[in-house]
């Protein structure tokens, strides 16, 4: 028994010791509880400050949340006694909150990608709210700097709310195949899976329809409630961001689908400079293959897909978004915004859409389907603990219909915290997609280049810059004061170094040893090495 399950059992023993006035039993239970306050183990707190339980899978909203709330309670309970946590243990819990959970809560709502299998009614609110109590409990016994950051977390997420967020940046959770991007006005996250990391689970009839939730699900938030309680009305084959089969058949069930549950690919990861970043995955699951990547900037998320193919006769789609309807879904045609009612198939000339606070722009001609409609559903259909009661709601959705095309691709932008006017005027020519195929996905944005090399490739990033990427990986190149700043990541977690040439000059990036990574509590650039190279 490990992780939170072990803590729950030890907590029962602790209560027994208290009732029996047995000091030694209480001490033994306490020691068992705090023994789980560590990182780098197979389950529990990971070295990137995510949390695993039931094998290698992210459990922020379930076991990890229970672990943090319970441990914070013990931290406050034991403070000032002989059972008090030591400095290292307190520091681990504080970092778990500040370097882990702080990233996945936006204005009092937990990210859908963090809920795991527990898709309860208003779960985003309740789970985020429990963190407020955990934060207050951790303050007792914490350093002044940690208390300051905890207070900032509370101000960002709980009443009275700020207009924007003071906590911004970009982080890839390398142990859990998940990326979070935060600006002052919006947040986005991507959840993936690999041959290392399980995407999601079905336990106790929780998450009966969540088969695709780890296939590159992308959520964007401005208020935080954009997806609140949408689950009964979802088309579960069109979870935002995923590429999946178009079918009226029931979504595959985890417990009888064998090897199809796991993504077979190792190439899943992300790179960041702390402010922007690129995330990529090879999807190889259920007979469907795709190369998917996301570029996160201060103003938008650029989504790329290539090599989409399957061994099925079913059509394939890529979901751009599917969220709660708040106002009209608008399409841009001949200089005017027109409302979408029901289902609308756009023409190649109509590639801009807007809804609520978010714009969407397709960067290449695609068969895009826009939906704005009322739907009915039942919570019990995906969470077995609910009564069989029908509820109604309204959703809007956008998806790209690839049909049965072999080697399909896509390019589209998501513009959070935008307006219809800004979406219409957005200058797409400022983004240069250099290549988008199964070998490489490369994009130029200003003086920065984002590159995912799935295999060794030579690419001309600009007229006077040729890069020979000898080791597959995810790279960022940025010109800074006449030098090239390089950020790089190994998505396979198998390389000790990355080799490349810039204009025929050799560059080698060496990663720190994995053992040192976990023991040193290094920040979230652990899989990333940076280097200045003179132009």
Q: What do the predicted segments below correspond to?
A:
Residues 407, 512-535:
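Solvent-exposed, conformationally flexible loop/turn segments
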Residues 67, 74-497, 502-507:
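Extended polysaccharide-engagement surfaces of secreted carbohydrate-active enzymes
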Residues 1-111:
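Aromatic-lined, polymer-binding surfaces characteristic
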């Amino acid at each position: 028994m490990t992780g939170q399950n072990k803590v729950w059992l030890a907590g029962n023993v602790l209560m027994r010791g208290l009732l029996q006035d047995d000091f030694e039993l209480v001490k033994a239970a306490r020691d068992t509880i705090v023994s789980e306050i560590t990182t780098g183990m197979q389950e529990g707190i990971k070295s990137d400050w995510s949390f695993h339980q039931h094998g290698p899978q992210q459990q922020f909203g379930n076991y990890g949340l229970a672990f943090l709330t319970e441990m914070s309670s013990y931290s406050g309970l034991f403070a000032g006694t002989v059972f008090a946590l030591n400095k290292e243990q307190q520091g681990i819990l504080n970092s778990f909150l500040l370097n882990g959970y702080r990233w996945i809560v936006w204005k009092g709502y937990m990210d859908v990608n963090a809920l795991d299998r527990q898709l309860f009614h208003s779960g985003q609110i309740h789970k985020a709210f429990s963190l407020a109590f955990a934060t207050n409990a951790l303050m007792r016994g914490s350093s002044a700097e940690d208390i300051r950051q905890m207070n900032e977390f509370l101000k960002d997420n709980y009443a009275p709310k700020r207009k924007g967020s003071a906590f911004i940046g970009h982080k890839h959770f390398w142990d859990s195949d998940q990326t979070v991007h935060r600006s002052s006005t919006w947040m986005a996250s991507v959840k993936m899976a690999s041959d290392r990391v399980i995407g999601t689970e079905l336990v106790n009839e929780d998450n009966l329809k969540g088969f695709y939730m780890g296939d590159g699900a992308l959520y964007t938030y401005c208020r935080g409630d954009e997806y609140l309680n949408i689950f009964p009305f979802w088309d579960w084959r069109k979870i935002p961001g995923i590429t999946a089969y178009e079918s009226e058949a029931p979504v595959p069930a985890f417990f009888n689908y064998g090897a199809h549950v796991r993504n077979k690919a190792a190439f899943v990861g992300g790179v960041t400079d702390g402010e922007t970043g690129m995330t990529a995955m090879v999807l190889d699951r259920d007979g469907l293959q795709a190369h998917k990547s996301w570029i996160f900037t201060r103003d938008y998320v650029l989504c790329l897909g290539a090599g989409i193919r399957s061994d099925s006769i079913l059509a394939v789609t890529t979901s751009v978004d599917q969220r709660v309807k708040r106002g009209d879904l608008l399409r841009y045609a001949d200089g005017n915004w027109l409302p979408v009612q029901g289902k609308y198939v756009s023409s190649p000339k109509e590639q801009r859409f807007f809804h609520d606070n978010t714009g969407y722009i397709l960067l290449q001609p695609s068969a895009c389907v826009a939906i704005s409609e009322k739907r009915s559903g039942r919570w019990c259909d995906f969470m077995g603990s609910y009564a069989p009661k029908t509820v109604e709601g309204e959703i809007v959705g956008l998806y790209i219909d690839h049909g049965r095309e072999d080697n399909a691709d896509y390019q589209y932008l998501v513009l959070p915290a935008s307006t219809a006017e800004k979406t219409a005027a957005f200058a797409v020519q400022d983004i240069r997609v250099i290549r988008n195929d199964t070998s490489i996905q490369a994009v130029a944005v200003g003086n920065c280049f984002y590159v995912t090399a799935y295999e060794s490739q030579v690419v001309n990033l600009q007229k006077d810059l040729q890069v020979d990427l000898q080791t597959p990986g995810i790279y960022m190149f940025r010109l800074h004061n006449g030098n090239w700043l390089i950020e790089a990541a190994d998505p396979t977690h198998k390389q000790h170094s990355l080799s490349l040439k810039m204009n025929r000059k050799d560059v080698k990036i060496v990663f720190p040893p994995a053992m040192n990574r976990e023991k040193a509590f290094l920040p979230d650039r652990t899989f990333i090495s940076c280097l200045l190279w003179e132009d």
